[in-house]
Structure formats: structure tokens, C-alpha cells
Amino acid sequence: WIHEQYNNWVMTKNKLDLIFKSYDIRGVYGDSIDQDIAYKIGKAFAEFVPDDTIIVGHDGRVSNIEMLDAFTSGIKSINKEIIYVGLVPTDTVYSLSGLLKKPGAIITASHNPKNYNGLKLCNAGAIPIGENSGLMDIKKLADRNVEIRIEKFKINDKHLGNEYYEHLKNLVSPESISQKLNFGIDGGNGVFGAVFDTLNNIYKFNVKSIYLEVDGNFPNHPADPSDESNLTDLKNLVIDND
């Protein structure tokens, strides 16, 4: 039994060393990051922040529901509450963290390939948690043998989208935009597609769009705009509608 526990600890430590980066947590799902690791990070994050309630959202990756179940189970293991905001961009979680003065977590691997997943964490007030501001403390807390009990997260219908959109309108009111702006948008099958219609109903831009359907398999091209080859379809969209 002791040998098994030691092996489990070594395995967890090796995975944590691989996935904890300077500003976030990222790894190949099912390999360096999995439900057990997500549970431990959820528990560690809940212990690290002093607040009783944590905002949680996620993007459209195919492994996100499993990650959500495990991460939220870790949070709830120490009896903390969750404000679930659903399928949203990272900006939404950070904005709500600032508005509500609550810590937040978004399950995402940003522009990494589809087989990756991870987490971005922030303190209350949308203060990012990075290598020199608490992320390594969370890693240490996660590096323990704990009883893992993962339960299906019960998704409720209480989202905070309205608060986010009202915040955007306070920053830039629709009335302040005197000229109709023309945009070409490639959603890259990422989570932006989940909020685009609401944003466009507010600001009423002239938009030509492609790939707004949220699909964690990224069937049209990788969700990495830093690679210029992924911008080919967007360039053609703009040229064709000039």
C-alpha cells in the first residue's frame, strides 16, 4: 500500500511539473492532465483563495465536461460555492471576477491543439495568478495524496452573461459608435462563436463571418492566429467582400 501511494505521488508530481507554466496550466488531456489532476488543482485552488465562492467557466474543448466535473468536485470538497458561467471566453471570467470581486477559473488551453486542456486562474478582482503570484503555491497544494471523489457537476441555468454585456456597454456604448464598422471575422470554431450573436445584437456591426460554430475538434484550422497559415480563410473573406 505504501509503495502504491508513493508511486501515485511521484506520478502526480511529474505531471504537475509538466503542466504548470509561467502564467497558466496546460497539458495533453489524458496524459499529463486528467480528471484526477484537475480534481487536485480544484481543491488546491479553493484552499489557496480566501473567498467562499469561485467563478468557473470553460471554452469548447471536447474534454471540458470531464474537466469541469473533476475541477468543481475539488472545489466543493472543501465546501466552497461555485458560480458557473458556462461556455464563455476567458475575458468573460476575468471581467466577472473584477465586477463581482470573486476569484475565477476558466478551463481552456488557449491556442494549443485540440488534444490539450488546462486552466487559467485569477484572484478576486481579476488579478492573474502566475508563477510569481501564487501559481507555484497552488502546485504545492496539489502535490498531495488526497481522496478523489468526482461527481457530475449539476449545471444550473443561472448565468451572468447580462452583467458581462452591461459592463461592455458601459465601457463602449453602442450610441458612441457613430460610423458603421465593417468586420471580417473568423471564429476558428472557438468559444467566441458562443457570444458573437449577443455582441452583434448590441453593436450591430456589418459582419461577414466564418467558422463561428463552437467545435472543440477545430475542423477548419487550428485555433492559433499566431500561425499566419491559419489566417488564409480570413484574408480571403476580407478580399472577397472588399
Give names to the regions the model predicted:
Residues 9-73, 77-79, 154-181:
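An N-terminal, well-structured beta->alpha segment
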Residues 117-240:
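Gly/Ser/Thr-enriched, mixed-charge loops and adjacent short helices
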Residues 23, 58, 108, 185-188:
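Active-site flanking residues adjacent to catalytic metal/cofactor-binding acidic residues
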Residues 26, 61, 112, 126-127, ...:
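Short, glycine-/Ser/Thr-/acidic-enriched flexible segments
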Residues 26-29, 59, 88, 120, ...:
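Gly/Ser/Thr-rich beta-alpha loop segments that engage phosphate groups in nucleotides
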Residues 54-117, 199-242:
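N-terminal small/polar loop signature for handling phosphorylated ligands or for N-terminal nucleophile
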